[in-house]
């Protein structure tokens, strides 16, 4: 969070797997209850309905403005970021983003969606929040994550933002984003998750917990027997190979350019990929894109005076 003229600039990265702010990460799973849930933890109360947030992930949808739950998740993310600084009431300028190839067509609809209520009262984890929305800045996903690294960029570079639902691809030449050379592929980490769970079911006839698969994808191992680990690792290697195959479809050549990877898919490339580590940079900070949104919005608003 940043502050400018008594307005809190809060960035929210609306992922399919996780909602990220500059300082928080929360899985996107959300479930509604008519009465307050018995157990505590990540409970949003809005318009008389209770929502438990953080168990599981949302499915891919091509237009987030058509899903009311992303508005609720936005309120949750803002509350979590404000809570880091013990703030309960604020004038808020939102900074968010959309996939590279979708932002032109969806920008204004998504902005209206996020700003649908100029003033909002709600409770999160038992604490009252009162927000006044002052505005919203929207940016292409992925690119903001590397803004602070642009000083290291020379010649041709390729950015791959691998999230839970999509992979966004963008060429950056001489530190400038090439808007005519950007693509979005539905090849997010969830595709690997589904394939791994199905492979275990097909081979061993058992269902495996998603959290176990997630641990393997993130860290390369888990406390399970070797045959199961080998099965999931094989699927992960196939998925990473498909990622690189897709990048080559868009003329990726490691001899001629450097590759920068952001998003949750970076850990899969590190754990299961075969690549030249001197030519590929994996940015591990899952909040990097949100931090980039925040920086860009702050600079833009400051220039306006």
Regions found by a protein language model. Give the residues of each.
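Nucleotide/phosphate-binding catalytic cleft detector across ATP-hydrolyzing
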Residues: 1-159, 176-191, 203, 211-305
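Conserved blade-register residue in beta-propeller folds
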Residues: 21, 169-171
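Ser/Thr-glycine-rich phosphate-binding loops at phosphate-binding pockets of nucleotides
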Residues: 162-168
């Amino acid at each position: 969070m940043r502050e400018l003229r008594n307005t809190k600039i809060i960035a929210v990265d609306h992922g399919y797997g996780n909602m990220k702010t500059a300082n928080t990460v929360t899985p996107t799973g959300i479930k509604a209850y008519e009465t307050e849930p018995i157990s505590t933890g990540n409970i949003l109360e809005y318009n008389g309905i209770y929502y438990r947030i953080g168990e599981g992930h949302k499915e891919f949808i091509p237009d987030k403005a058509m899903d009311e739950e992303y508005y609720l998740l936005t309120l949750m993310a803002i509350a979590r970021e404000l809570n880091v600084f013990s703030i309960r009431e604020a004038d808020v300028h939102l900074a968010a983003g959309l996939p590279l190839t979708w932002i032109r067509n969806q920008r204004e609809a998504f902005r209206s969606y996020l700003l649908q209520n100029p003033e909002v009262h709600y409770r999160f984890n038992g604490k009252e929040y009162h927000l006044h929305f002052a505005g919203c800045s929207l940016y292409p996903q992925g690119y903001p994550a590397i803004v602070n690294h642009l000083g290291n960029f020379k010649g041709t570079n390729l950015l791959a933002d691998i999230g839970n639902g999509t992979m966004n691809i963008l060429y950056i030449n001489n530190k400038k984003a090439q808007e005519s050379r950007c693509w979005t592929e539905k090849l997010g980490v969830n595709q690997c998750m589904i394939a791994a769970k199905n492979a275990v079911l097909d081979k061993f006839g058992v269902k495996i917990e998603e959290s176990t698969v997630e641990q393997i994808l993130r860290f390369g191992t888990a406390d399970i027997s070797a045959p199961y680990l080998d099965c999931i690792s094989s699927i992960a290697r196939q998925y990473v190979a498909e990622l690189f195959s897709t990048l080559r479809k868009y003329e990726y050549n490691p001899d001629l350019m450097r590759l920068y990877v952001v998003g949750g898919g970076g850990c899969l490339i590190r754990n299961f990929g075969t690549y030249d580590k001197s030519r590929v940079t994996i940015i591990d900070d899952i909040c990097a894109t949100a931090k980039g949104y925040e920086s860009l919005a702050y600079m833009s608003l400051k220039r306006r005076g």
